[in-house]
Amino acid sequence: MDEKQLVSQALSAAIDGVLGVEQIAAIIEKPKSSDLGDLAFPAFQLAKTLRKSPQIIAGEIAEKIDTKGFEKVIAVGPYVNFFLDKNATASEVIREVLTEGEHYGDANIGEGGNVPIDMSAPNIAKPFSIGHLRSTVIGDSIAKIYEKLGYQPIKINHLGDWGKQFGLLITAYKKYGDEATITANPIDELLKLYVKINAEAKEDPEVDEEGRQWFLKMEQGDEEALRIWKWFSDVSLIEFNRIYGKLGVTFDHFMGESFYSDKMDAIVEDLENKNLLHESKGALIVDLEKYNLNPALIKKTDGATLYITRDLATAAYRKKTFNFVKSLYVVGGEQTNHFKQLKAVLKEAGYDWSDDMVHVPFGMVTQGGKKFSTRKGHVVKLEMALDEAVDRAEKQIEAKNPNLENKEEVAKQVGVGAVKFYDLKTDRNNGYDFDLDEMVSFEGETGPYVQYAHARIQSILRKANRKVNIDNISLVVSDAEAWEIVKALKEFPNIVKRAADNYEPSIIAKYAISLAQAFNKYYAHVRILEDDAQLDGRLALISATSIVLKEALRLLGVAAPENM
């Protein structure tokens, strides 16, 4: 039973149901110091009803309460403080972790419901920059978390492969491009053309108009325009898939904006039939004043569609195809207004399922405090950064463990894992500065620090060379360090649920750091391999810790090497 539930039931019985179990569970607190117990109930809540001071109420409850399952229950001022039965709790938690293994913390909350996750979405014909990392790894981690809770995540790469920028790129290719040069080095050469034509279009309206015309041709199915565009797309995907391979990220579908180009007319017609489209300066809009939003521009004066038109078609397609219980969009915070408009237009059209669409925004990655911008050519390629992280990891592993057999493979797991972990430990709505020195450090709140704790446990278990009997686990928790680990292990299922509820992988990353820290304190304080009556209990404790560390890392898409 959950410890909050245990405390809440005992309290509700002690106060004759004046507050229900759920009401009590909602106000249970954790004392600032473990010396004051594991959980605390503030008696202020009962003062008005019972017409007594909180201090008196706390004292009466502490005397009356059934202490089964607790080491002791005491009144501390206006609080009732609960000390869990450490030995019984430890045995129960460790047995549960060792029995369930990687499935510890699994639940069937989702009951198999489909959850499309719109993620990654790099623009074709542009480098896969560090700026694309966040959507990719946050989306991948959320998918793993949701799968653990019984949902069916569907990872969709909504490639940026449609829009006026491709009309401009075709313009640049026709003016300056050389097929052989581009074939030899596709992304770099296309980036040069893109930066060059954007600078020209800013200065010369005719260049901008030419790009607009080429995009219009794409929308109208012009053979030449689509042939060039398809070539841009094919060479881009080769590069993207190589990078996804390094990141260890897979997708269920690659469906770019272009996939929906033949599905937009139906949604525009639907809006028209529902009298939601209004003309404004020759363009078609949906008025969203009642939502305190600007009008949504659905079609421009020249008939060209916009980002929101394509997203309306996308949302309708996903509902029809996947019948989702939730549809997530892992897209930067700068698009918040766009998603408000998108949901409002669907709501106006009578699609109440739009309530199940969730924008999962995130903060920006900078370097040296500067934003990455493809238009201006300020790009740091993610692949180069990953390769550099792996090199740095390998040098540190060489220094720590020169005889390690599979050094190169471990360096990849540590280097790539370090970059992913650093991103995911950052609160999703916050940005961060991309700093490889900090990311790949084996000290501090980093991926390598957590991986090293896991590898250290594996090393101890190999040295012990002893099978633990799950049915006969008995751990005498006589030190604070062991108790901190037990409490952390007990909390893991709740951590997973909280991460899912908040679409926040950082909750799991921070948990992994604190569990690794708790283990390292225990390791420094206790002779784990001392051959005494408690040896099996200690081995069971660290074995359970290893299982949960590995699973926490897996949920973040980070490997857990056995040796480092």
From Swiss-Prot:
Catalytic activity: tRNA(Arg) + L-arginine + ATP = L-arginyl-tRNA(Arg) + AMP + diphosphate
Top-tier EC class: ligase
Keyword Transmembrane among UniProt keywords: no
Pfam families: Arg_tRNA_synt_N, DALR_1, tRNA-synt_1d
Keyword annotations from UniProtKB, A to Z: Aminoacyl-tRNA synthetase, ATP-binding, Cytoplasm, Ligase, Nucleotide-binding, Protein biosynthesis
Motif 'HIGH' region boundaries: 122-132
InterPro entries per the UniProt record, alphabetical: Arg-tRNA-ligase (IPR001278), Arg-tRNA-synth_N (IPR005148), Arg-tRNA-synth_N_sf (IPR036695), ArgRS_core (IPR035684), DALR_anticod-bd (IPR008909), Rossmann-like_a/b/a_fold (IPR014729), tRNAsynth_Ia_anticodon-bd (IPR009080)
A GO CC annotation given for this chain: cytoplasm
Localisation: Cytoplasm
Domain of life: Bacteria
MF terms in GO: arginine-tRNA ligase activity; ATP binding
One annotated GO biological process: arginyl-tRNA aminoacylation
SUPFAM superfamilies: Anticodon-binding domain of a subclass of class I aminoacyl-tRNA synthetases, Arginyl-tRNA synthetase (ArgRS), N-terminal 'additional' domain, Nucleotidylyl transferase
CDD domains xref list: Anticodon_Ia_Arg (cd07956), ArgRS_core (cd00671)
EC identifiers of the protein: 6.1.1.19
Alphabetical list of NCBIfam families matching this protein: argS
Subunit structure: Monomer.
Similarity section: Belongs to the class-I aminoacyl-tRNA synthetase family.
Protein name: Arginine--tRNA ligase
Organism encoding this protein: Lactococcus lactis subsp. cremoris (strain SK11)
Organismal lineage: Bacteria, Bacillati, Bacillota, Bacilli, Lactobacillales
Gene: argS
